[in-house]
Amino acid sequence: MYGVCVTVPPADSPHRRRNALTGEWVTLSPQRTKRPWQGDEAEEIEATGVTYDPDCYLCPGNTRANGLVNPDYSGPWAFDNDFPALSDGIGANEIGPNEIGLGKASLDETRSAVTEGQAAVATERSLFCSEPVSGRCRVLCYSPDHSKTLTKMTESELSAVVQLWSDEVRQLRQQYRWVQVFENKGAMMGCSNPHPHGQIWAVDTLPTEAVKESMTQAAWFESQGRLLLDQYRADEEHSGERMVVATEHWSAVVPYWATWPFETLLLPRRH
């Protein structure tokens, strides 16, 4: 008979649940249903020609849903999400920048991480297994302009956004195992505010996809003595068939294994 999982996080707290069929984990954030919604249920909404909206929670000087007042920021600005999907108050697990994650794990370490799900199946033997997840969520406003998306920015404005991404990731990596920069585009994809912005999620657990990719790269390096993505970049550049652009520091390609029509993979020239 199956036992019962020891860890049972509060129903309204961030946690992850194990898929009993695959052994993989899914992160849930029940408390997110309480956040305010300024998006739309079906139609795409995008502010055009409006530089300031007095009702926008992200415009400079406006009051957010939690009562805090935004500063009169003049460039890209980041702050902790008022309604975060993750919290660092539960299951804190500080991981240094040289621990597992972001391509720095050894093969043995990565194998250990990827088998967390299988180990849970073997030890807990429960179909309803969950555990707390610790993390931090940041919101990044690209510009004080309510309608200026990334595609409308100047090169210097884009550079400022990229610099903010770098600064945020560098700081969060000192504590969390995984840091993800992303943007939900459009109301149907979960964008609750039309003011151009992105997000960063930092979490103390590794996503399944990241663990699998790290395992593959570690195994390739052990057998070939060369970084997998370094070899792949060189092969794509030689072929030229799927190249999008190549610069002094980066190459962008449509990956050979692309799932989506406009999928691109950025490959750095230094590591």
Language-model segments: what does each one mean?
Residues 1-195, 201-271:
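Active-site microenvironments that recognize anionic phosphate/pyrophosphate groups
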